[in-house]
Amino acid sequence: MGVWLSKDDYIRDLKRIILCFLIVYMAILVGTEQDFYSLLGVSKTASSREIRQAFKKLALKLHPDKNPNNPNAHGNFLKINRAYEVLKDEDLRKKYDKYGEKGLEDNQGGQYESWNYYRYDFGIYDDDPEIITLERREFDAAVNSGELWFVNFYSPGCSHCHDLAPTWRDFAKEVDGLLRIGAVNCGDDRMLCRMKGVNSYPSLFIFRSGMAPVKYHGDRSKESLVSFAMQHVRSTVTELWTGNFVNSIQTAFAAGIGWLITFCSKGGDCLTSQTRLRLSGMLDGLVNVGWMDCATQDNLCKSLDITTSTTAYFPPGATLNNKEKNSILFLNSLDAKEIYLEVIHNLPDFELLSAHTLEDRLAHHRWLLFFHFGKNENSNDPELKKLKTLLKNDHIQVGRFDCSSAPDICSNLYVFQPSLAVFKGQGTKEYEIHHGKKILYDILAFAKESVNSHVTTLGPQNFPANDKEPWLVDFFAPWCPPCRALLPELRRASNLLYGQLKFGTLDCTVHEGLCNMYNIQAYPTTVVFNQSNIHEYEGHHSAEQILEFIEDLMNPSVVSLTPTTFNELVTQRKHNEVWMVDFYSPWCHPCQVLMPEWKRMARTLTGLINVGSIDCQQYHSFCAQENVQRYPEIRFFPPKSNKAYQYHSYNGWNRDAYSLRIWGLGFLPQVSTGLTPQTFSEKVLQGKNHWVIDFYAPWCGPCQNFAPEFELLARMIKGKVKAGKVDCQAYAQTCQKAGIRAYPTVKFYFYESAKRTFQEEQINIRDAKAIAALINEKLETLQNQGKRNKDEL
């Protein structure tokens, strides 16, 4: 017998069925999308190096060249190649972590190299522990850490780079501990290599904080590389004798520095001069290195009970003629690296701060503090003992604190595992926990940046939810590589915005409740709190773009439109006004990716094109009325004419600020003047006006890209300088006479009224603002010269 359901029961059951269907559908959908991390067999915490190594291993196994009989080989390889292309890129990795593959619709990729490339050219130095592969985000911090770096800029396809690789590996092992050996893959980091002036491969440079980079021009043998490197190593070896021995020892001991002395006698072996120099460089600032010739200093050696060649380390305060020699370390090795490790292992540990004096000590000095729980884990890395010396000039003291002696103190600082933090001289109120690599150069960079920045570690007690001052808060997880990459940029941004905005970081693995309260679903999520207003940052991980975001919050470059204001400002715009409008929906991932680019574009078009956006989730009916069928929908509204309602839709693949700007400028009426051979001669060469000329060819792609930029320049300098264009395909002879050898070429022709002659100057910049600034500077110089000439008359 059937059972009749009431209307309410029917609706309730129908909702349940629909919900179950949706759950099953989503499970199937999720199951079909393979996780990029799983594809490569790495964890979400994997470093760039680990991702490269995992991809290379898979590439050599799955490449279509090695699987010619597998019809699925191409498709399978595309999947892992796509995963690698996304995860190796910091910005794409952040998008993927936050939105999944939907957030990558503008970055499709799809190309890969041959099997031989992955076997022989890919990740040349990833398996060499002595060589550190540096990426753009960490390069400056590394080479400015205070250590000496020798960096190899190479390209994977360069045969000379591969010829050098075995020598570079041997060289790195030879000088390990003496200086840092780095490598930069210019195939992956083209921008970094261009910024460093690298235009040939391999290029080898010495870097040290406070000095200009030095390029190596010698032959590429290990011996020549070692010789060149040693020229830049700070090494002083003192010959000790009766006249200077006592004073040298006492002066060093008074400064807390010990001596490593090799005694050379007839019997046994003492260290060679080359080994002594290397040890001096390796122990620079930690231990003085000296030698004594016992053949000429026989009495002094006997007084020290030295009867044969030997090497000994005398720590500060050691009794030199103590026959028990309990405090003196005698070394049996003749190898510089072995001696270095033994000496540095015997150096005293950092000062242990007590719970009783901690607050007072941190209130009067800047500190880098290691937190440990009972056993000091840092003693496993003797290299870290260099920190005290390398941070001395920055007035940063280095110490340690045992959390097992006062658990409450560490708990209040949210320190629950061995870690280190910088305290900025204000007690325990202002501090920042280190989340980077536990290696010397990374800790040095962190300490120097942190003490001079204005970023603080946040928790429930100091979270600025209701603070009257605006705050930028970075919600992050320490295991997330894009999060760690963002932290140095936040420090830079905090200095640029000091006094306008406070900066803090919140570790969501420690403060899960706070992160859930603000619905943090991906890391890093950066939010600006301005009393009741909350704004999420969606831009790239750079201090400059964070600065742009804050400036845009204070002075918005994009008009938020409503149906009413759209009608008033866009539909009924003035005759000479133009608009670009973004129709978007907040839930749409491509819209979210577009928004920071849209704002960046708007700032560059101020005064030329009005830029707006309209929320189609809030104003759904209006967007439907405007026939908006997809998001984001970008439209250009040209100057009003007698024609019906008119606009142009953007159909380009790239939605970055540059591409959109070029597209919008292309609709503006031309301000520059097209010149013929006759008008070029009459108006430019024989006239009395300043001119800037774009020499171009219609078939030239870069010329087409530059054309809107030149029109923007023409508008920026209108009234001061005339702008003209010469078609070098139509008027080849004119361009030849003007000395044009490439397209586009920009030249500034300026008229010197005092001499009644024209001068010309080639401009090798392609940015309208930069060209305008250069021209204005030149005009000011000409004006000042004119004034001086009048004064002289």
UniProtKB/Swiss-Prot annotation:
Pfam families attached to this UniProt entry: DnaJ (PF00226), Thioredoxin (PF00085)
Motif Prevents secretion from ER location, chain numbering: 790-793
Disulfide bonds: C158-C161, C480-C483, C588-C591, C700-C703
PROSITE patterns reported for this sequence: DNAJ_2 (PS50076), ER_TARGET (PS00014), THIOREDOXIN_1 (PS00194), THIOREDOXIN_2 (PS51352)
Highest taxon in the source lineage: Eukaryota
Signal peptide residue numbers: 1-32
Listed name of the protein: DnaJ homolog subfamily C member 10
Cellular component annotations (GO), alphabetically ordered: endoplasmic reticulum lumen
Free-text function comment from the UniProt entry: Endoplasmic reticulum disulfide reductase involved both in the correct folding of proteins and degradation of misfolded proteins. Required for efficient folding of proteins in the endoplasmic reticulum by catalyzing the removal of non-native disulfide bonds formed during the folding of proteins, such as LDLR. Also involved in endoplasmic reticulum-associated degradation (ERAD) by reducing incorrect disulfide bonds in misfolded glycoproteins recognized by EDEM1.
UniProt domain J: residue ranges: 35-100
SMART domains assigned: DnaJ
Entry's localization field: Endoplasmic reticulum lumen
One of the GO BP terms on file: ERAD pathway
Domain statement: Thioredoxin domains 3 and 4 are the primary reductase domains. The thioredoxin-like regions Trxb 1 and 2 lack a redox-active CXXC motif.
Quaternary structure (record): Interacts with HSPA5 (via its J domain). Interacts with EDEM1.
Keyword Endoplasmic reticulum found: yes
Region (Trxb 2): 348-463
Disulfide bond listed as a keyword: yes
Glycosylation site residues: N530
Enzyme Commission number(s): 1.8.4.-
Cited PANTHER family: DNAJ HOMOLOG SUBFAMILY C MEMBER 10
Residue numbers spanned by region Trxb 1: 235-350
Location of the Thioredoxin domain: 130-232, 454-553, 557-662, 671-778
Keywords, ordered alphabetically: Disulfide bond, Endoplasmic reticulum, Glycoprotein, Oxidoreductase, Redox-active center, Repeat, Signal
Gene responsible for this protein: DNAJC10
